[in-house]
Amino acid sequence: MRIFLCLIATTLSLFLKGEWPQFRGPSGNGHANGTGLPLKWDEDTNIKWKTAIHGKGWSSPVIWGKQIWLTTATVDGKKLSVLCLDRDTGRVLLDKKLFEVAEPQ
């Protein structure tokens, strides 16, 4: 799941111009206006960059300007963090723990 989120965010950021502010895209309907989208990708094909993240992906990526924002959580759900990645390079710009709970619900 960790690499998957980064791969999806990377693939989207390569071909989409503009922002991706919410789950399922700009209009919330799963449609994107990009052109030349790849029909195939894997670990090495049509991937611009990869960035390992800690925990597991906990949200849809948000793409805004030159940044990709996402949240991660530990497997036990006790810690939630927010990450900001550089859209062009995948470099981590911010990695901040948002909160920690003793007993997740």
Q: Where would I find each of the regions flagged by the language model?
A:
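Sec-dependent signal peptide recognition
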Residues: M1-I8
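Hydrophobic h-region of N-terminal signal peptides that target proteins for export
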Residues: I8-K17
